[in-house]
Amino acid sequence: MAPVAAAKIPTEWHQTGMAAKAVSSRLRASIYRALDRAGPCSRRTASRFFRYCYCSMAVQGKQGSLSLPPVAKEGLAMYNQNRKEGTPMNIVVLDGGTTNPGDLSWEPLERLGRLTVYGQTPQGLAVQRLEDAQAVILNRLSLGREEFSRLPKLRYVGTLATGYNTIDVKAARERGITVCNVPHYCEEAVAQHALSLLLCLCNKVQRSAGMVRDGHWAQAVEESHLSLSPVALAGKRLGIVGYGSTGQRMAALGLALGMEVLLFSRREKQAPAGCRWVGLETLFQESDAVSLHCPLTEETRGLVGRKLLALMKPTAFLINTARGALVDELALAEALDQGRLAGAGLDVLTQEPPEPGNPLLSAQNCVITPHVAWAAKEARERLIRIVAENLRRYQEGRPQNVVS
């Protein structure tokens, strides 16, 4: 057999399997041989792994000279070892109560190993509860370099969320620990919640309902033409910062209400009629409501501060269902209390739960919900299903949604 020609597999995980179709049968044989070296596996497992090649696989000159990426090799080796020895993977869910308070099933994860579920875990007990864990599933707890150094058996971290800012991804990568998130599971629920916050502010729901509860029905009716006058959204401008899947759904809701939608994102993409791409400052200047749907990164931390808030109309609203640290909370509270902003609807804060002295807790026209926009039952069911699928694919040596 002639030497296998050098080949380059794209560095991204190919769920479509297009990479497999472009590779010769000789390279396929080389992949099988490399898999055999990683551990005994069925032809079916090897074929599945081949179709979803992960990272770079370099074929060097001689036939059969192929190296598997460490993350795939480790996952496949662990899967084969556990299968051979008949020992299931130790899987620990540290704070399952935030996702499943008892109304859902953990069965998708139970099928993958020996599962231990804690409803809540104090941060100080995390390492103790993970001493024998090979895989951990968590939502809001933090795992950093110190914790990883004390957990030699840990090989996998799965987040019960899209965001993973509580995980030190760099430290995990250095220790060969794979981290996976769930990028798409609650877009509809979060967009719906963002709209509900906006409608609550526009229709003065909290204040008018409170007046009725306190026995001031007639006064509430009288003020409905004055301070309690609703704001009609049709014809107004909705600014959306971040045009990912949730931002796109929020845009669709705005269009359905007859609003013009202004968009800002790192990368512009095709948008429906009624949407217009603008610069960030223009968006804050021209919008009657601004809704944040961008990720929290070093570049976006504190994005909405005094400068952008000063550009907003005094009749405008700010909605944040993304991450609390996107907003300078002191600057926002000052803008609300000084009447430079009509209202804010927040589902997220920089610190959760907030300290009693957080100025937003007493700010004028500020509606705060406790980070529950994502929590629709349908979204949580989807979340558990994808978390289990992430782990299953890691066990088979073909991980998905890898962020480490």
Annotate each predicted stretch with a short phrase.
Residues 13-15, 32, 36, 54-57, ...:
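Short terminal hydrophobic/aromatic SLiMs and anchors at protein ends
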Residues 17, 24-25, 30, 39:
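Intrinsically disordered, low-complexity segments enriched in small polar residues
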Residues 83-180, 285, 305:
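An N-terminal-biased, well-structured beta-alpha scaffold segment characteristic
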Residues 142-149, 260-262, 266-359:
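Rossmann-like adenosine-cofactor binding region
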Residues 175, 183-237, 403:
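Phosphate-binding beta-alpha-beta segment of Rossmann-like dinucleotide-binding domains, i.e.
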Residues 243-244:
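Glycine-rich Rossmann-fold phosphate-binding loop(s) that bind the pyrophosphate
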Residues 247-248:
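N-terminal Rossmann-fold NAD(P) dinucleotide-binding loop
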Residues 382-404:
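NAD(P)-dependent dehydrogenase/reductase Rossmann-like domain
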